[in-house]
Amino acid sequence: GGGLELALGCHLRIAADTAKVGQPELGLGLIPGFGGSQRLLRLAGRAATLELCLLGAPVTAERALQLGIVNRVVPAAELEAETLKVATQLAASAPLALRATLDVVNIGGECGIEEGLQYETAQFGLMFATDDMREGTRAFMERRKPTFTGR
């Protein structure tokens, strides 16, 4: 339902092992709104999307992982800690490279492989002009964690 649709709008999804997700809207006289059918289709494929949307039965977190709806399943007691760990890792990333990675993946999913490769190559080249690339390389050589500035 709405919770799944909200999660489908996220770049990464971590589920507790006790979670269940579904699209029960048909039973309410509705259709999945807010991108529910379209995002689910792109993540899980046509057959799984039709099953979830037409039958309305929720699936377990483990099944959602198999379908590609979630990225990870962790014990419920560890959900917050795992989520904070992932968020901390992302926050420590080079902001320009993080944004470019998201752009490359998103654009690549909407175009042909040749166009996607050209865009990726262009973005890769742009990263060489950043202070963050120099800091990341320096930190790697010095065996320390980088301090990125977003420049």
Residue ranges, per PLM feature:
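Crotonase-fold acyl-CoA enzyme core
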Residues: 1-98, 129-130, 134-138, 144, ...
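A short acidic, helix-capping loop that chelates divalent metal ions and anchors anionic groups
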Residues: 25, 107-110
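Helix-loop "lid/cap" segments that line or gate small-molecule binding pockets
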Residues: 52-53, 104, 108, 123-128
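A short structural micro-motif
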Residues: 107-108, 143-147
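Short beta-strand->loop
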Residues: 112-117
